[in-house]
């Protein structure tokens, strides 16, 4: 994407850079800022300023699970403090600001402070008060820390206190450097969004112009410049909202020079191929090619149970198929008006995919290789062969849905649940066989159909049925059986970074379970996954 950096979001919009020290809340900082129509990006705390390709309007140092004084604790590049832009430290970030001035400034608290606390703001005068402009003098905030400031850093004022934190808020006397022990990004903090707005808009001077209407124009211009007047793009589509929106955006940018490819891996949902054809080709006017590679994928995954090995194989084989299709398209169009080399490969990668795949030393190590990020072969990520183009890479899921509406995609399509590129293959825990694929496919169809019939589909962020690797004893037809277990998963979420299990009524789950056991051969037991994210991920592999 570096070919046209001047059109990337952080160069087209005022940007707040959030440096992540491993807090479970860090992504919420970016979310809250974007809800304020201020563009924000999150990078690991190891990001060196010299390697940053843009100048942010402000920098936020996130919370984290470390103690700043421990050996091996992460520390920010000191060069950020010489950048000349406002800085806000949150929790660990506050302690990092204080620690770099004097290592004795941060101490272990005599009592930990988790949950709600009453914060009292202190007026000092001048720019120091800007963080709390327009807010009440006292309000409840969310705390999550064991360490605290033992003394006020030299050159700083105290701007807020709580019963357990004498220095719950600090501000530099002359520089726009602020620190908060509380978490303004968490919804439990009253005025949290206002605090972030005061920092981003009033202190950093960011314009509140980050909208999908603006993004569409910027991204179409970027795509056109990147691809050029004759270049062609091949795109992976799966039937999910991400790939559909990405495909429509590419169609708007370069017209018939975009070719969508649906790889039938044999792991699609019931009737998925026909539905994708109808959506993309008939409703959205997109060139669609269906490549049947089901036998190749099934044979290649035989005997593989490890989820990372599955993802790596699927990622590599996907690109093999796409490169074959690219050659066919180029040959067919060699002497036509659309002649041109296919040099790019479109993916519907989202920002949560990127965040989950970022690794740095510490607790925010890679959760899993994402099939849209780490599952690709090196020849793709290192610029060999087809080059990656990911227009949704900086967006959260709700922003993608908004973008889809901006592009004129119908409500039903925009609200479709995500469907991973590897399909049912990563919803079958353990080894994949044709029989197990069919079980998972039928169970999923029953589950989703009943969710739709109950009028719950749009209330749920994502839902699916998966197959457990173990089996269980049951009694069917007066006989003992030892058969498979289906796992049902449905979550409520807005950004797919955090999620909670959807609270179905007991009667509904009973009816779903009864249908699956009666209608799906080889299944004798059904379980519902109540795990939230974190600690779980939404997909099981």
UniProtKB/Swiss-Prot annotation:
<protein>
    <recommendedName>
        <fullName>GMP synthase [glutamine-hydrolyzing]</fullName>
        <ecNumber>6.3.5.2</ecNumber>
    </recommendedName>
</protein>
<feature type="binding site">
    <location>
        <position position="539"/>
    </location>
    <ligand>
        <name>XMP</name>
    </ligand>
</feature>
<dbReference type="GO" id="GO:0005829">
    <property type="term" value="C:cytosol"/>
</dbReference>
<dbReference type="InterPro" id="IPR022310">
    <property type="entry name" value="NAD/GMP_synthase"/>
</dbReference>
<dbReference type="InterPro" id="IPR014729">
    <property type="entry name" value="Rossmann-like_a/b/a_fold"/>
</dbReference>
<feature type="active site">
    <location>
        <position position="183"/>
    </location>
</feature>
<keyword id="KW-0067">ATP-binding</keyword>
<dbReference type="Pfam" id="PF02540">
    <property type="entry name" value="NAD_synthase"/>
</dbReference>
<feature type="binding site">
    <location>
        <begin position="238"/>
        <end position="244"/>
    </location>
    <ligand>
        <name>ATP</name>
    </ligand>
</feature>
<keyword id="KW-0460">Magnesium</keyword>
<dbReference type="InterPro" id="IPR022955">
    <property type="entry name" value="GMP_synthase"/>
</dbReference>
<keyword id="KW-0547">Nucleotide-binding</keyword>
<dbReference type="InterPro" id="IPR017926">
    <property type="entry name" value="GATASE"/>
</dbReference>
<dbReference type="GO" id="GO:0003922">
    <property type="term" value="F:GMP synthase (glutamine-hydrolyzing) activity"/>
</dbReference>
<dbReference type="InterPro" id="IPR029062">
    <property type="entry name" value="Class_I_gatase-like"/>
</dbReference>
<comment type="subunit">
    <text>Homodimer.</text>
</comment>
<keyword id="KW-0315">Glutamine amidotransferase</keyword>
<dbReference type="GO" id="GO:0005524">
    <property type="term" value="F:ATP binding"/>
</dbReference>
<dbReference type="InterPro" id="IPR001674">
    <property type="entry name" value="GMP_synth_C"/>
</dbReference>
<dbReference type="GO" id="GO:0006177">
    <property type="term" value="P:GMP biosynthetic process"/>
</dbReference>
<dbReference type="Pfam" id="PF00117">
    <property type="entry name" value="GATase"/>
</dbReference>
<comment type="pathway">
    <text>Purine metabolism; GMP biosynthesis; GMP from XMP (L-Gln route): step 1/1.</text>
</comment>
<feature type="binding site">
    <location>
        <position position="311"/>
    </location>
    <ligand>
        <name>XMP</name>
    </ligand>
</feature>
<keyword id="KW-0658">Purine biosynthesis</keyword>
<feature type="binding site">
    <location>
        <position position="533"/>
    </location>
    <ligand>
        <name>XMP</name>
    </ligand>
</feature>
<keyword id="KW-0332">GMP biosynthesis</keyword>
<feature type="active site">
    <location>
        <position position="185"/>
    </location>
</feature>
<dbReference type="InterPro" id="IPR025777">
    <property type="entry name" value="GMPS_ATP_PPase_dom"/>
</dbReference>
<feature type="domain" description="GMPS ATP-PPase">
    <location>
        <begin position="210"/>
        <end position="416"/>
    </location>
</feature>
<dbReference type="InterPro" id="IPR004739">
    <property type="entry name" value="GMP_synth_GATase"/>
</dbReference>
<dbReference type="GO" id="GO:0003921">
    <property type="term" value="F:GMP synthase activity"/>
</dbReference>
<dbReference type="Pfam" id="PF00958">
    <property type="entry name" value="GMP_synt_C"/>
</dbReference>
<keyword id="KW-0963">Cytoplasm</keyword>
<feature type="binding site">
    <location>
        <position position="478"/>
    </location>
    <ligand>
        <name>XMP</name>
    </ligand>
</feature>
<keyword id="KW-0436">Ligase</keyword>
<comment type="function">
    <text>Catalyzes the conversion of xanthine monophosphate (XMP) to GMP in the presence of glutamine and ATP through an adenyl-XMP intermediate.</text>
</comment>
<feature type="domain" description="Glutamine amidotransferase type-1">
    <location>
        <begin position="15"/>
        <end position="209"/>
    </location>
</feature>
<feature type="active site" description="Nucleophile">
    <location>
        <position position="91"/>
    </location>
</feature>
């Amino acid at each position: 994407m570096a070919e046209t950096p001047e059109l990337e979001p952080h160069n087209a919009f005022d940007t707040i850079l959030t440096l992540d020290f491993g807090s479970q809340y860090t992504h919420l900082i970016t979310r809250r800022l974007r809800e304020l129509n201020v563009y924000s990006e999150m990078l690991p705390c190891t990001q060196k300023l010299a390697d940053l390709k843009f100048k942010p309007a402000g920098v936020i140092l996130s919370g984290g699970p470390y103690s700043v004084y421990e050996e091996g604790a992460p520390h920010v590049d000191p060069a950020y403090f010489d950048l000349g832009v406002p800085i806000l430290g949150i929790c660990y970030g506050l302690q990092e600001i204080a620690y770099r001035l004097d290592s004795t400034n941060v101490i272990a608290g005599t009592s930990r402070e988790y949950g709600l606390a009453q914060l009292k703001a202190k007026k000092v005068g001048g720019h120091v008060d800007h963080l709390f402009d327009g807010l009440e003098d006292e309000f409840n905030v969310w705390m999550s820390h064991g360490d605290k400031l033992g003394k006020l850093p030299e050159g700083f004022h105290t701007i807020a206190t709580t019963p357990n934190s004498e220095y719950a808020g600090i501000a530099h006397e002359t520089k726009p450097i602020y620190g908060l022990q509380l978490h303004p990004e968490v919804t439990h903090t009253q005025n949290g969004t206002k605090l972030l707005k005061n920092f981003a808009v009033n202190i950093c001077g960011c314009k509140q112009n980050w909208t999908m209407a603006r993004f569409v124009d910027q991204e179409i211009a970027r795509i056109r410049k990147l691809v050029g007047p004759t270049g062609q793009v091949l795109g992976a589509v799966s039937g999910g909202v991400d790939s559909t929106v990405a495909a429509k955006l590419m169609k708007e940018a370069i017209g018939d020079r975009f070719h969508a490819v649906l790889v039938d891996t044999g792991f699609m949902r019931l009737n998925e191929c026909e539905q994708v054809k109808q959506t993309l080709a008939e409703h959205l006017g997109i060139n669609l090619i269906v490549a049947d590679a089901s036998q190749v994928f099934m044979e290649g995954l035989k005997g593989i149970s490890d989820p990372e090995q599955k993802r790596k194989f699927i990622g590599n084989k996907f690109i093999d198929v796409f490169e074959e299709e690219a050659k066919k398209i180029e040959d067919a169009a060699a002497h036509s008006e659309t002649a041109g080399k296919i040099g790019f490969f479109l993916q519907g990668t989202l920002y949560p995919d990127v965040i989950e795949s970022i690794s740095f030393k510490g607790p925010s190590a890679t959760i899993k290789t994402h099939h849209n990020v780490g599952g690709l072969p090196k020849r793709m990520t290192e610029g060999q062969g087809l080059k990656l183009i990911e227009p949704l890479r900086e967006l959260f899921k709700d922003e993608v849905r908004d973008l889809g509406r901006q592009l004129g995609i119908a409500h039903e399509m925009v609200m479709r649940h995500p469907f991973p590129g590897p399909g049912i293959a990563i919803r079958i825990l353990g080894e994949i066989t044709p029989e197990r694929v069919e079980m998972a496919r039928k169970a999923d169809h029953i589950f989703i159909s009943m969710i739709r019939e109950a009028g719950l589909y749009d209330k749920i962020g994502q839902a699916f049925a998966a197959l457990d690797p173990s089996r269980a004893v049951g009694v069917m037809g007066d006989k003992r059986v030892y058969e498979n277990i289906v796992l049902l998963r449905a979550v409520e979420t807005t950004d797919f970074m955090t999620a909670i299990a959807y609270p179905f009524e007991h009667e509904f789950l009973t009816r779903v379970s009864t249908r699956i056991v009666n209608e799906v051969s080889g299944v004798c037991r059904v379980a519902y996954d109540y795990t939230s994210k974190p600690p779980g991920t939404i997909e099981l592999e």
